[in-house]
Amino acid sequence: MAVRPAALAMLLALGACLSCAAEPRLGVFYFPGWRNDTPGAPSDRPWEPIKAFPDRQPRLGWYDEGQTSVMEQHLSWMAAHHISYVVFDYYWAGRPILAHAVQAYQASRGRQKVQYALMWANHDDTRPRTLSEFDGMVADVIDQHLRRAEYLKVQGRSVLMVMVPGFLEARTQALGLAPGALLQRLQQGVRQAGLPELMILAGAGAALNEVTRQARRWGYAGYFAYNYHAGVDGRTRGEMRASRSYLELDEDYRSHWEWFLGQADLPYVLPLTSGWDMRPWGGSADKQHDQSISTPAEFTLHLQAARKLMLAHPAKTLGLGVVCCWNEFGEGSFIEPTQGYGARHLEAVKAVFGAPASGSPP
């Protein structure tokens, strides 16, 4: 019987993701913003605003991020609680900045148990300013990261996330290039280095928008999200607003999951959240949005729903989920053990993602 090309592609994807179905993998985003006097950090003394919220004090204390001993403990906790990989926020300002945390990872023994990937946090819509600057970033990513054995691969391809695809495409056009040309240039650099093409994921929200319409054309292989604040089309419970409780935020995330798994043209790494409460950094525009931080019990239900979808859709999710975040203390998105919350959120991860894949979620 002849197999149509589209059907063949889906069969190949399903075959490649059989291991995903057997063992869904959960990762976590890591914000490298907790070292004094570091260009790119929230301030010269980034811990100071957090100290007004003593329940958020890390169990390790107000540490100097970038020390290998700190990263060793982080990785030990991750591995012990079934976090398979960590995604470091990657910043480029003509040179890498806030790279101290990933460098500590690379120097640690724990990297053997927890893989890593990069998310290019391209908040700056003026970068790259030139092709040579972009080429410098490509060289840094290749030489400092993609050649490493512990870098996260899916179907044999290293995973790179781009937080704001629209900004990158705007810079592509500003440099006088065709749509998707910077991503093509990145892939060309990777091939010339003798490495397999990247699996580049686009940060996106649900519904038809510029990113979900153009991602495949631009050269992306799938979608992800760092975080969401509302549901599909910016609505929470039918109103144009952000969530005002974790229950609402969980509902909002599930609405994005449903849309992507049902309608998106590319795979979708399932995003999860421990919550949102930005009061240490001045608070959200809608103050009630800062009531969206989770209890361990609420977070457990969120994890269970995500795991169920990852098991049901191994090809569409690539068998991957990623939590925001390990340590976004200023935004209230963290699962790193703290004085006030202990390790209860991590224990929830272990309870849910440590369960046998062949069984029902706990």
Regions found by a protein language model. Give the residues of each.
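Positively charged n-region of N-terminal signal peptides that target proteins for export
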Residues: 1-5
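Bacterial N-terminal signal peptides
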Residues: 7-17
